[in-house]
């Protein structure tokens, strides 16, 4: 079984070149003994132990410590020492001296010392000799122990486990580095996963199992594998495949296999039913390596030791007890340098826990334990103990491991199984040899590839698999060979020398072809692998390495030569060469390459029985094919028997057969022709059916109401839509910038308005300098004006000797201004944010529209299909004619439909325009929102817009309306509107359902309308003939019975009869013509109905869209007009407020001048002013208003002219019809609405009247009178924005007027009591006179209406809100006329000036307003009699005195007020 069975006796090893195979020698000591004997016989030898090469050929070779460092006793000379050949239970001491013992090397000293420390032997009798027999170095003299010789360096033998079995005990920590144990995973590359994946799996495995563990429990593996989210069935199958040991735990290779199978399944591949052979072998081999390494570690780490303690044991009488060797695994991987000798006196080998050990056996008799002479007295080396008995386990002591051996006959190519020791470094070699980047620049060495593995001559299966994969990786073109240039690159990566590679190529390249096939490449790689593991290259290939292809080819050539030679000799010797050769004789049995004259296994033919077949041709020309393969090919003349050999009967029979065949062929042809005819007719019928269906579908397309307008070029339409969309997108930034400018202007105007209101509400806290810059900022001109004013006041005070009244500073004014500024700025930012949101939404909507337009564009495939089926390119002639015919018919129907639509558009286009205009004239003014049709939807839209209170809601409503309009336009153009991202599927389904229902209703309405029109048309067509036919009947029946006629009754009767016949004939002719006309009309009507079914529906839809577009355009125009009117109205309000303040100040100054009698002309001019206003505002205010309160409908007559289509104006009309505070000019035209608010400051009015939303819900009953409208028209120009602009001139500057005028203006500040009362009267009375204009304003600007300033007027206003409309309906009065309400002294009229309602003023307590205005208002009646002159002046004003020079005073009144810059 073993090639070195005599190794125990020191016999020679295997004769094969190279080192021995693993397990070839039990112990290196057998060879060492002979060498030691030879060395001891040499006189110069100082030590019997010399350096021996006992292990594998590794560089460098180190000395092996083979001695026994026991305490040697001197032995007596002259005696033959016995040899220790067995395992005696008791050994007598040997006399004599032992040879000198070398020192223990340093690398084994710690091991030896550790063994001595652990050794605790039982007390034993002292013996005079050690376990090893000592041999005297001389024959006569007693030798003392000589000095130890040079230490022998340990030599690695490759048998770490075997050496460990002979050690007297295990050591707990052979090396300090082994103290900390981790998870050991062999450095072996798995072929079925990549290196990166294997590294990741190693990391995952180590982190899961922890240190010191080599297997993963089932729970941990389940947790990891469950992360793949595979089905439990698949995971169970993966576990079954991966757990190769069936232990319920996974080693690392099994875990890697499980991860590989999981990845395989996750990628969609199926799991194998069983593992492939290569994967199974790799996993099993690696698992065995891991398990064996664990056993080795446990053996080394065993605590129970039996090593002698050299520090205690000196001379013991009892011999040591020999420990049995421990059976070790055969495939140890970790080769370490081990001590091959016994480091001390042996106490015997103890049985190990891993199996029954070998029991000590005595080889001699128990009494024969004394030294025996051996016949040789020369020096002998110490012989180690040799186990000769058999243990309980039935194993020989330390038997050599079993290696895989080729089982076939010698020299036969075959793939053997992988040796149990594995193939170390084969993966590293395979990885290096694979094609990879950067291999051209690398210099390769044998580092990492060398080893001392035992490799058989034959190639193993694992090797062959790797070599084949490597060959296929390099043979990318599948040429089947590797060229010499590639071989240089591949083999050069092994790092071998060039001569070695040349020998490898010479051995592998059989026949010197210059290239290697698959088998030859495997041979070359195997030789390289053997060379890397220390084996020399052979001079010629052994039989095990000869590839089958080479061997079979050579054998085939030789066999062929032998056959030819034998055949030639046989023919020559037998004379067969002179005979004709028989070509039908088979030589297969004798000329077979496979068998030696055996019977062939199959029906295989060789060349010896070849017979040519003329019918079996390999090529047939296409011209020689028969149609349908119906006619058989005539036989070759060579194969047809000669007709000469046939008899007459046979010839007749053949003729009859041929005739039958011909008849059958004719019948088959007829049948196939009939079948083809049937198929053709069926195909034609189907084609006609398809033609009809296509025509019907085209007609449906042409008549469908939702069909897009056919313009002939959809691309042109799409480009036009894109251009239009781009223009609209370009206009968005411009609109946004305009909105931002408007917001900025509103912000500045709001601040300016607040300043004016605050100055009016808090006169004492008015700032000394009023800013006229942007946003109310104080400019240098304002400072100059204020300085000039102060100097003038000082001069006036110095001239008059009066004290200057310096108003106290109000610290709350800046705070109020700052709060208002923050509020206005916040609102401005919110509006700008909404504008940005709207802009972004519009941009997004535009992008979606653009994408939809782009998606509908022509692609290459669409263009190809369009050119094929619309332009009829690349189709059959019949289909091309059909396409053109279809296009012509469709075009003609379209033209007729357009003509009819054009004819109907004339009479039908006017009523839609007249209906909306005429309908409002007949409806009652109390229900303007009850209109039907399109105005209803517009009204509802407007109402919904006005119902939104916050700007965010209005912005969202505007965005929704814009998207709806755009969707309608896209639907009209045949483009599907994009679905909004925020719309849920349920909402989309509901919307689509409602759209379908609406379309269905519209289609039904269209059908009903068309039916009614058709019936009407038929009635019109049938109407004229029926009276004509009935008239003769009615006329013919009365004449026959007249009995009164007496002259020639027979003649008359004949004439009447002839007449009746003629009339009957005419009637029949007319009826026939009528029937023909009816039939013709019906046919025409049917044709028209078919042609116009969809055109009329589309016409109505288009007309509706056009009307909607016109309405929307008108609505947008009115909206723009309303916005312009609103802006102008705001400017007019600001101007009116400025004029009011200016007028109040002028009035105060004029009253002061009157009291002081300084300027009589100024007082007379002031007296003229109220006189002019009194008849305008006071007289008609109550009289005409009370009388004309009921006839409210007349003002509504002219309203629909401008508001019939605009929902926003209708909402305003609804809110303005009820309240009485609305000025009548609101229903006249947009122009009066813009001019009316000029003199009206809304902030001073009560909150109930300035809020438009509050007015909509307030219970107001009266309506303005037309006379007051006229007065308002006359007064509008007085306070218009134009006049205000004209008033602003250079005269406003202090330097623009004379010093005398400035002095006269400033004199008014000297009288504190009266200015306060006058200012209070003005501030209280002026809002009452101008409270109506805010009601005319549109809803949007209404929210900022209620500022804090109106609180000054609160004492009198909130007490009686219901009668307030009656007084506020006199807005025509200009700002200066607070007293023109003499007739309103009634207690129910709070707004009139304080002098008039002394009872009403105190009756209303002032709730929230500041105390100064309330005090001044309450003290006004008391101040009137004190002065006397103010009462007289007011009396004059009440009497009707008018102020004639109002315009002159207005021009010179803007000195102390700011204005809004354009």
Swiss-Prot record:
Residues 603-614, 806-819, 825-839, 988-1020, 1047-1089, 1097-1117, 1126-1153 have a biased composition (Basic and acidic residues). It comes from Pyricularia oryzae (strain 70-15 / ATCC MYA-4617 / FGSC 8958). Its main location: membrane. This is Actin cytoskeleton-regulatory complex protein PAN1. The lineage of its organism: Eukaryota, Fungi, Dikarya, Ascomycota, Pezizomycotina. It comes from the Eukaryota. CDD domains: EH. Keywords: Actin-binding, Cell membrane, Coiled coil, Cytoplasm, Cytoskeleton, Endocytosis, Endosome, Membrane, Repeat. Residues 1275-1291 have a biased composition (Acidic residues). Component of the PAN1 actin cytoskeleton-regulatory complex. Residues 230-265, 496-531 form the EF-hand domain. GO terms for biological process: endocytosis; endosomal transport. Residues 21-31, 47-60, 157-171, 302-315, 636-645, 1173-1184 have a biased composition (Polar residues). GO terms for molecular function: actin binding; calcium ion binding.
């Amino acid at each position: 079984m073993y090639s070195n069975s005599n190794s125990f006796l020191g016999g020679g090893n295997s004769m094969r070149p190279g080192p021995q195979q693993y397990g070839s020698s039990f112990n290196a000591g057998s060879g060492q003994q002979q060498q030691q004997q030879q060395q001891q016989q040499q006189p110069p030898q100082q030590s019997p132990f010399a350096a021996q090469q006992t292990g594998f050929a590794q560089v460098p070779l180190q000395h092996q410590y083979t001695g026994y460092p026991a305490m040697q006793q001197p032995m007596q000379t002259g005696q033959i020492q016995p040899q220790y050949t067995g395992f005696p239970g008791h050994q007598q001491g040997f006399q004599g001296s032992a040879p000198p013992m070398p020192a223990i090397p340093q690398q084994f000293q710690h091991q030896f010392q550790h063994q001595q420390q652990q050794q605790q032997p039982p007390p034993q009798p002292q013996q005079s000799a050690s376990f090893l027999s000592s041999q005297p170095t001389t024959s006569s003299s007693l030798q003392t122990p000589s000095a130890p010789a040079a230490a022998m360096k340990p030599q690695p033998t490759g048998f770490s486990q075997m050496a460990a079995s002979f050690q007297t005990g295990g050591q707990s920590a052979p090396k300090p580095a082994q103290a900390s144990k981790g998870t050991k995973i062999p450095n072996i590359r798995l072929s079925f996963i990549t290196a990166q994946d294997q590294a990741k799996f190693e990391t995952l495995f180590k982190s899961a199992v922890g240190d010191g563990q080599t297997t993963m429990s089932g729970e941990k593996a389940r947790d990891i594998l469950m992360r793949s989210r595979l089905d439990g069935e698949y995971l169970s199958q993966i576990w079954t495949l991966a757990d190769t040991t069936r232990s319920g735990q996974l080693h690392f290779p099994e875990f890697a296999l499980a991860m590989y199978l999981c990845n395989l399944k996750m990628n969609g591949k199926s799991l194998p039913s069983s593992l492939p052979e290569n994967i199974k072998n790799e996993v099993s081999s690696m698992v065995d390596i891991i398990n064996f390494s664990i056993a080795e570690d446990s053996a080394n780490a065993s605590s129970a030791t039996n090593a002698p303690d050299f520090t205690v044991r000196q001379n013991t009488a009892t011999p040591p007890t020999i420990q049995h060797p421990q059976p070790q695994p055969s495939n140890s991987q970790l080769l370490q340098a081990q001590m091959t000798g016994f480091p001390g006196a042996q106490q015997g080998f103890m049985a190990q826990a891993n199996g029954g050990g070998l029991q000590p056996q005595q080889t001699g008799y128990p009494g024969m334990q004394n030294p025996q002479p051996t016949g040789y007295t020369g020096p002998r080396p110490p012989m180690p103990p040799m186990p000769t008995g058999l243990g309980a386990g039935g194993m020989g002591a330390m038997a050599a491991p079993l290696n895989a051996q080729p089982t076939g006959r010698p020299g036969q190519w075959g793939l053997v199984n992988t040796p149990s020791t594995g193939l170390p470094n084969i993966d590293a070699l395979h990885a290096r040899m694979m094609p990879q980047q950067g291999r051209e620049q690398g210099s390769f060495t044998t580092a990492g590839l060398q080893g001392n593995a035992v490799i058989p001559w034959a190639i193993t299966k694992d090797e062959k698999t790797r070599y084949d994969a490597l060959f296929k990786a390099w043979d990318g073109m599948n040429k089947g060979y590797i060229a010499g240039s590639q071989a240089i690159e591949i083999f050069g990566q092994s790092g071998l020398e060039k001569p070695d590679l040349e020998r490898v190529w010479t051995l592998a390249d059989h026949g010197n072809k210059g290239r290697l096939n698959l088998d030859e490449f495997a041979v070359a790689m195997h030789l390289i692998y053997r060379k890397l593991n220390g084996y020399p290259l052979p001079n010629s290939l052994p039989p095990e390495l000869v590839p089958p292809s080479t061997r079979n080819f050579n054998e085939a050539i030789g066999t062929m030569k032998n056959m030819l030679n034998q055949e030639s000799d046989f023919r020559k010797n037998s004379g067969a060469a002179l005979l004709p050769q028989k070509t039908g004789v088979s030589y297969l049995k004798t000329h077979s390459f496979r068998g030696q004259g055996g019977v062939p296994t199959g029906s295989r033919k060789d060349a010896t029985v070849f017979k040519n077949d003329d019918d079996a041709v390999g090529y047939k020309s296409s011209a020689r094919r028969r149609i349908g393969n119906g006619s058989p090919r005539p036989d070759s003349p060579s194969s047809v028997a000669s007709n000469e050999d046939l008899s007459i009967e046979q010839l007749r029979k053949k003729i009859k057969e041929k005739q039958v065949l011909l008849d059958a062929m004719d019948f088959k042809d007829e049948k196939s022709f009939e079948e083809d005819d049937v198929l053709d007719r069926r195909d034609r019928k189907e084609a006609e059916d398809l033609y009809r269906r296509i025509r019907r579908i085209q007609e449906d397309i042409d008549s469908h109401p939702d069909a897009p307008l056919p313009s002939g070029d959809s691309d042109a339409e799409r480009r036009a839509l894109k251009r239009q969309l781009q223009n609209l997108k370009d206009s968005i930034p411009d609109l946004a910038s305009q909105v931002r400018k408007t917001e900025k202007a509103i912000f500045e105007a709001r601040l300016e308005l607040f300043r004016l209101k605050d100055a009016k509400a808090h006169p004492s806290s008015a700032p000394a300098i009023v800013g006229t810059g942007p946003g109310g900022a104080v400019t240098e001109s304002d400072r100059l004006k204020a300085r000039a004013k102060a100097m003038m006041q000082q001069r006036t005070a110095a001239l008059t000797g009066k004290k200057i009244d310096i108003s106290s500073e109000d610290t709350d004014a800046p705070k109020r201004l700052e709060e208002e500024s923050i509020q206005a700025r916040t609102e401005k930012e919110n509006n700008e944010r909404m504008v940005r949101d709207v802009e972004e939404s519009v941009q997004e909507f535009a992008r979606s529209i653009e994408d939809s337009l782009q998606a509908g564009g022509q692609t290459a495939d669409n263009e190809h299909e369009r050119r094929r089926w619309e332009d009829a390119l690349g189709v059959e002639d019949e289909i091309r004619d059909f396409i053109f015919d279809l296009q012509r018919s469709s075009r003609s129907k379209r033209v007729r439909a357009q003509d009819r639509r054009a004819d109907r558009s004339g009479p039908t286009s006017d009523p839609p325009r007249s209906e909306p205009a005429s309908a409002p004239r007949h409806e009652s003014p109390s229900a303007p929102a009850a209109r039907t049709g399109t105005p209803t939807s517009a009204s509802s839209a407007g109402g919904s817009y006005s119902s939104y209170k916050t700007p965010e809601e209005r912005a969202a409503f505007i965005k929704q309306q814009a998207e709806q309009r755009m969707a309608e336009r896209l639907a009209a153009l045949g483009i599907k509107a994009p679905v909004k991202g925020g719309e849920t599927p349920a909402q989309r389904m509901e919307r689509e359902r409602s759209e379908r229902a609406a379309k269905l209703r519209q289609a039904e309405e269209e059908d009903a309308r068309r039916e009614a029109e058709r019936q009407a048309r038929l009635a019109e067509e049938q109407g004229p003939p029926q009276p004509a036919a009935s008239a003769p009947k009615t006329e013919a029946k009365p004449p026959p019975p007249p009995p009164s006629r007496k002259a020639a009754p027979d003649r008359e009767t004949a004439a009447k009869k002839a007449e009746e016949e003629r009339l009957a004939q005419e009637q029949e002719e007319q009826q026939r013509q009528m029937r023909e006309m009816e039939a013709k009309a019906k046919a025409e009507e049917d044709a028209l109905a078919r042609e116009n079914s969809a055109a009329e529906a589309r016409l109505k839809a288009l007309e509706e869209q056009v009307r909607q577009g016109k309405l929307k355009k008108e609505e947008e125009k009115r909206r723009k007009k309303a916005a312009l009117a609103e802006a102008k109205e705001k400017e007019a309000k600001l101007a009116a407020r400025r004029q009011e303040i200016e007028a109040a100040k002028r009035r105060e100054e004029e009253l002061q001048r009157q009291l002081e009698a300084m300027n009589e002309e100024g007082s007379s001019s002031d007296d003229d002013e109220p006189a002019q206003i009194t008849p305008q505002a006071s007289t008609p205010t109550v009289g005409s208003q009370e009388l004309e309160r009921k006839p409210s409908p007349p003002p509504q007559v002219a309203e629909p002219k401008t508001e019939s289509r605009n929902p926003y104006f209708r909402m305003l009309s609804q809110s303005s019809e009820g309240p009485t505070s609305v000025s009548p000019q609101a229903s006249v035209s947009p122009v009066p609405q813009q001019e009316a608010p000029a003199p009206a400051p809304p902030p001073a009015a009560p909150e109930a009247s300035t809020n438009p939303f509050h007015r909509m819900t307030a219970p107001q009953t009266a309506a303005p009178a037309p006379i007051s409208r006229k007065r308002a028209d006359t007064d509008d120009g007085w306070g218009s924005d134009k006049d205000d602009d004209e008033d602003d001139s250079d005269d406003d500057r202090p330097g623009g007027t004379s010093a005398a005028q400035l002095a006269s203006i400033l004199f008014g500040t000297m009288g504190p009591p009266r200015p306060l009362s006058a200012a209070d009267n003005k501030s209280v009375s002026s809002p009452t006179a101008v409270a109506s204009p805010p009601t005319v304003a549109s809803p949007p600007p209404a929210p900022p209406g209620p500022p804090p300033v109106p609180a000054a007027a609160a004492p009198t206003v909130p007490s009686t809100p219901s009668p307030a409309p009656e007084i506020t309906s006199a807005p025509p009065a200009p700002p200066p006329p607070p007293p023109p309400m003499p007739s309103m002294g009634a207690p129910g009229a709070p707004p009139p000036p304080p002098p008039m309602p002394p009872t009403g003023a105190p009756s209303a307590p002032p709730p929230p307003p500041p105390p100064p205005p309330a005090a001044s208002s309450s003290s006004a009646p008391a101040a009137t009699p004190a002065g006397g002159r103010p009462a007289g002046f007011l009396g004059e004003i009440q009497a009707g005195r008018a102020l004639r020079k109002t315009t002159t005073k207005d021009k010179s009144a803007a000195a102390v007020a700011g204005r809004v810059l354009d």
